């Protein structure tokens, strides 16, 4: 290991693991929580953890450009997106998710299974991850549970949220696996993409709400065969 | 080998002369067997002459096909007859065609006969043609298979060569293949010449007649040639039977004596066969049309057995 | 043979091909000006066919048994594809057939297509007519599998467009689709077959395919044979792959029906011959047995179904199936003889088959042209509405009658000659093998006899009901004779029928190169007994026949009736009078025998096959004994359609409908698909 | 001159310009000029690549090899045809009052962005940038799909964007894993080089398990975007609801661009793990897509969905051809890409004309006898359909036969047979359906089309090119495709 490390890497690693674990917990809460506004807040917190991880990486490993990532995440995913979604929710005044396909206990069970799967998938790569333990596992779990969340929810907004948690998972993986995150240009590109994506989704959600008088995506079944 | 004009003329004359005689004989003997006096044996000759002289009445709906049909029937039967060995092993026209050509020519005649039956737009003619074509169609395989049986043993479809081959092979008749083929051909003969139990040449009852139904609208010389052609066809088929299955007696050389002898024996054989036909016609009733296939398929099976036995006993 | 002779025919062929192209383009360009388009299209096709005819006949006369070196029609700019053609005896023989028909049909079409001018776009008709002829010629000339398949598919495509020319009728559209689908499935089999050869030889060239089968593993060889049998069998319309044929041929314009029944289905025969005699090497016994069996079955069933038809063109289409069967009998026997190493007999059976191929092409085309003329005059294909046409269109009637006699294999016409050859080969086949297999020969011979007799019955019905007696409908009553060009087209084919019938020995010399190429034997010398006018079976003392002789003798004998007339009937008069109508005042057309009635005995005898069912509706005023009107209709069941094709089609639709449930519109379901795929692959990967 | 960057910039510029003008004609004019220029540049690039082998700019930010050049050509050609068609198409829509000027401008802007994104995908050297560009195309096309703002189009757009961005998230995972593999086990101060041109050289040294995992994610992710079954479910919805020009773009190139991205990973994987793993996946899912498409075609009730499923079948064929992984099959597959890109837009344009005439896409409503109403459109559509079902003399017959015979030559007999069976099944479906609507006599009397030549230039351009290249493949183009096939086949 020829990595020049000044501050104690263990500490950083510990902190990162902690934050990652918190992200996972938040994800689980998202799965069971049905109030939309709460969901949005939970997502904001999750993103906050993500930016925290980025900051830690930047601080402990002198990767100055990762600060930028952290900052962007903070601005975009902790403040801007939640604000945007809040506005949307208030505009189309829908407060809570209708009954999901699977009820809470079952979904918890399913997510547990998916977590297990995430660990199985990630196990071969434990040697590869430089920061924290099992962050990769958590990242993959975030992906799978986010996926599950998308399937399980019927409101357009909560599906968007689920998609965003998947994005968080990607970021986590990027940080966890690759020390310094991706090249800055890529990070920026990805970040702005997510922004645009959410706006597009917002527009669509709004239009759907207008023309269908509902946001229940399971009602969108005109196109068949 | 080449053609002898004399032989052709002779055999043509023989066919023309002998054909009405055979039908006359059969009519007469049948009557006798049924305790009737019946028409004299030469009655058919008188009929022909009478018909030839009479006016012709043609249906208003008929077309040219109606008027040419009798000549086609007559000529095909006649030229088919020239391919059959009657007095000598060497048939005058065997070079121009054997069994297959003969069957073909008879079929051509039947083709036009049936058309002639349809042409006057009467229901009877159509009925007759339909039945005629049906029966001949299901008779055909038996006929062909029987011919094949003989032809295979002789290795040729040329009737003269077949006769010759059987001539040399001493007394082939005991060969089971030949017996069965003979039986099959006999049934086919009954069918082709419109005899009981397939058809009744004597009847004019609308729903039972077949051959007569087609002739219903014919008159005068057209009728004459139709009748004559039919009887020639009957003679041809009979002489195939008698000469292929009892060939021993055909004239070996060209001397007049030999010819005379052969002629006498030939006539005797014909009379024998006619007697058989008469007996069959008398002791059997006419079959329903849809029972005829059973009889003919029996003939087919016989021929097939014959074929099988050539296969087995070689 | 003079040198540079192949060059000559090559030049002629190129000119012909170019003319076909010119015809296509010009008739497309002129489609707005109907008559002009007709003139250009069929003028070009006629000339082109004439060029082809000269080329192929000169080639065959010169007797090149070995192919002349292949040359590129035009340089290909796509890799692995070479538009190279070569003329060899087999290709030339079939090319001769297509060119011959091309000439007659073009002449006929001048008058026939005029009827469409203004009603439909004749430009399209002419264009695809030329394309079809072009593609078919190229099929016979192609020198590699790639080019062959291209020509083959273009042929199918243009045939489809011609079949659906009158696409306003639903029947036409569905028939076209059925045809194209089955032909495409067949093409798929051909592709696979050729690819198996390609796998063995790493090349597409027909040169390299020659006798390739001997170097292939037996399993693959048999697989290739079966694939080819299926693929070419679909095109040829063998039972049970025939269902498209009676659907597609009748609905096409009659000149096209003639072309399809005459030539297009023969491309299947060509392919089968090419493959099994040229490519696949020494055949195992079961190939021949299979082909012979299929041939026999097709012949009998084809004619039986034909008898049940009262649609004139469907009847003719079914007869194509029958005749394909007869051709295949010859080919199958030839394969069996090759297996038992009797090259001469193989040559005999092969030439029987090929002879029947050209015969069928000629008289079937003739009959379809006749049917076209009748259709043109009466605007119906239903024989029950015809009758009495012999008086209104005598020339057409005469031509049709000659065609009917020929197809019924009656002497002295060409159908008789080729079936006579088939009989001869079957007869002598009995001696070729000691095994029980040899019983097949006489039995299939008997079936051939049955076929012939039934065909005769069928054409008595076809001609008798259509042309004889009195007209059954107003259409038939005001029918009129066809225009000159249509009569000329039929006349040409009639003349060819007579020539092929009366001068078989002379024609057989044209087949020598083919038999030499495929079996190594030259036949015509062995087939003449003494004089050049007598045809003989090859065996030391096989039968002999001389159609010309029979005709002459019959002519001589006709002096007898004349003489008798002079003797007895000089003074007798001829009277026209009404037919006896059982005492009714006048004979109504309804009292005539109908086509359905004519074939009823056969329907009853073979009811196990036909499963006939009838509907009778009678109306009466006061007592059921005095019926005022009675309506009778009889149907037969087409076993293959109802027992194989329809259930299969239903099954496919059922499956497809079921599968649509996958795309039910719920995004959750779609997400689940992706999710499951991901999980699956994760397991697969780790 | 900066070739690659200008290729990416020109569409952006035209997008910017389009956002300023209002006149429909000017909008169309701008895009036509722009894409004509693109085509010219594409040919230029094609020449440069043939001579230089690889072209790169901005210290390798842009990077073009034979494969990219081939793609650039396809995109440029299809975009040009689309902009040729779009102007007239929207003018008719506007006249019919189904669409506002604002939306029309929106279309032209987004269309240019869409194209720009695709150009960036094929020219980007950095896998991350490639991902970013692909996401950009996805977003642009989503708004295009939703352009008409009908209920159904919104539904389609929603499904498209959800599934699409989910797939792209997965693809992003793949990118991250690849990057991790590039970083390697020994983290160092300097950022590792994440450029394709670098990766492909170090591929054999990369961590095998990571690459494998990356490929799985890339396969599902980019596969979703490329419409491989069973991730294809958004495809028929989007294709049928988008305005016809967009459907043409989606089916003509967009699917193939996603496939291109997938191929990059495939190449990497083959370099690292050998051909077996990724090849098998491509082959299996390709075949699955083909066999899934056939029954849906057979019982389809909507014209554009029918065409969409046929695209699914073609994509499946291309994947299978590449998956068989012999030089001949890959060559055939790439060629097939090209021919399909020239064929499918024609069908969608024709469908557009039919839609505007009959105001419906339901086969039942269009009913029999379109040929009587729109003779020219139907004629061209028939030709294109014949081509799409692989009938000669069109090139797809040739490319299909090449792939299948390649399979035979490589003793992959069963696979080839399956391919052929699927092709025939699709043929039967398309023939049955199109005959049902195109031919025959119309049920109700439609007013014969007033402007029969609408859209003919675009269709004529593509069909002409198709016919030309069916009988004449220039040696240089062959060389290009062969090189591209070499790249895909892993021959450096």
Regions found by a protein language model. Give the residues of each.
Chain A
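Alpha-helical transmembrane segments of multi-pass membrane proteins predominantly involved
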Residues: 2-225
